[in-house]
């Protein structure tokens, strides 16, 4: 009798258990599809893989890669100087900034990117670089907004690591006179990620307590300053050597993560902007107010590869979100001209100043990428055109 009591429920519940497993697997598959779509939209929004029209006789120097791999696959080659179409702007690039996105394209990781169209065995597009600043060289006939000689910054169709690039007119704005080309090149992806993460996802309001995890990095240095411009009480998390930097950006409090774990402290925050991706989600929940918001904008940096890479944490977050009172989600920036203009206004007003860690000439792209890979940059890493020495 006892044997029957133990075996019969198993027989009855096994189909139910299998049904639940199938439903969970379908849900996870759906989330992966959604994230793949989001990443594809992000690539389109940044103009990340749009090759310029390479026609004409003049040549220029550009970074080229024909195989996936380490920075050693990157080469400087002579390529044809692009010619703008009717809706494009030809920019003489003065500076370009490196982003983790460039690293992921170079390595071809996470591998799901290859299935999304970047090329299964070799890159379909041999060029890199999104953020740029420079001078307008020529404009298409449908571009009354700019003229030759204008100083601009924005995004350059996935080919900004070059002496010239064609950019969509909607992805550029005029550069403020009070910042350098190097500073302007640091802005597009990093600053708009911080701006949209805090404003659109975090809904930051004056007086709220906001924590920036990874406050000394490319996105983090912008996030501290933008959050302060919103009137928030800002706490920055960084390493010992970067405490003074983060304080200088306006942080009200700083936490040295080598000595203190903010996820185990008593303080609760209204908004957490996570640019690191190493803490467990349960830790963020502990550090948030009951109705707090956690915005994840990083999945671990350039070394986060594998099959789905930084998408793993957002999938886990989406599965958890319906069952908790706090809001937790990922953030992929969209390069919008009005937000570039907003950043230009903040810089003109002196409320935001881009932080530059190192600059490298175009010829030292391998060294620049290796430094980015190390993951300890204080602010942004910049490429400059027409210079021979690293500064």
Language-model regions: role of each:
Residues 82-97, 111-159:
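Glycine-rich beta-strand-centered segment in the early N-terminal region that forms part
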Residues 2-4, 8-25, 333-391:
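C-terminal hydrophobic helical "lid"/dimerization subdomain
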Residues 118-131, 138, 151-214:
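NAD(P)H dinucleotide-binding glycine-rich loop of Rossmann-like/cofactor-binding domains
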